[in-house]
């Protein structure tokens, strides 16, 4: 009788732990509200981002290359097409194809299940708060910190790191990005 009670309690604890991690580890998908003070001009077009809780400015999901699909699948990245109007850079882009895991976009019950999208070559930017007229120029420009996510070239994504605190506290521009993973990013063959 006591053995059954102990086993039941252990089973309940195990189920609770799995459910807890399933809920806690799933990234929150959030679309932020664009703020016109963050509007900037890039080589590909105009973008507008948002203001983080700590006051830093952020831009999510800015394309840095064309989608590596079709004829571009096994090629070096190509510059993105210019866009018309203003790109609302307020949402993290899809992650690159990978199997679900701790650094992917799925919870623990989805480990080893495929996730992601080949149209994933986007970057995220955080900067201290500057109005358009007060952006540092020339020798006053801020340093840039590129954050390359880990994951053994098989898992991970640029959205796994939030650069808002670093940007605001240390007056630095923080950039994270997605890059092709696994065989879509690291496959080598003479025919390619």
Regions found by a protein language model. Give the residues of each.
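Non-catalytic accessory segments of hydrolases
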Residues: 2, 8-192
